[in-house]
């Protein structure tokens, strides 16, 4: 989450006047994340999240995201539920941007990861994949391997300013991953979160209390979602791979949804691909984020280290 677009209280009060969620008491921007502008709203009826959609989100796809969250919540997954206005509309416009209000989920994201939290993460990821069965609308992954080459090209040689030789190293890694990437029919596919980082998972008393930020969700390999989590959750201090964390995620996931042999064999390649994807989007954002945006820029080199780790790993 982040804030690129500022709002005046008067503008927000007028916007909320079309909803039955009480009157505005207070609001503030949320700086975590890098994609959309997010605000925590406190009204006389409770707390809500307002999202203004920016940048990579295609406005025509927003009904798909909102529909997915509604579907998952209906199947028992703790995720934000879109709030409709009095006319029954969940997707609106505010400050010349698409906007949506969702319910607020209790809990906090973990600041110190451990194997027990990773075990719970693995379980809930598998539950998400199972809960998504039956949501048949397809959203292709806009950040699939086909997008990585153009994304690298768009960064020019800026990566070499962060780390000499970065561009050539990533280009070679990308070629290798593309050559080994599974064909569409090779692995089970379904609805994936595609961005399930620790700041998108809330915990209470050691248990997952909610999953948020579904705006990269798409239809892709289920095991690729697992690979993203292995990248995001298993490196202490953004540097050192922690095998016990990876083992816990795998154990938790397979206790709910066992992996096929083909999925297990593909995981090293999928993990390299996930590292490339987040290295490139972080690099792009590092170069292009406005200096005055209320947003936390993320270090691209943390994912270069992950890429190198998974290149040297024969299994996960």
UniProtKB/Swiss-Prot annotation:
Pathway(s): Amino-acid biosynthesis; L-threonine biosynthesis; L-threonine from L-aspartate: step 4/5
Keywords, ordered alphabetically: Amino-acid biosynthesis, ATP-binding, Kinase, Nucleotide-binding, Threonine biosynthesis, Transferase
EC number: 2.7.1.39
InterPro entries reported for this sequence: Aminoglycoside_PTrfase, Homoserine_kinase_II, Kinase-like_dom_sf, Pseudomonas-type_ThrB
Pfam hit, one: APH
EC class of the enzyme, as a word: transferase
Record's keyword annotation contains Amino-acid biosynthesis: yes
Catalytic activity: L-homoserine + ATP = O-phospho-L-homoserine + ADP + H(+)
One of the record's GO molecular function terms: ATP binding
A single GO BP: threonine biosynthetic process
Membership in a protein family: Belongs to the pseudomonas-type ThrB family.
Protein name: Homoserine kinase
Gene (name only): thrB
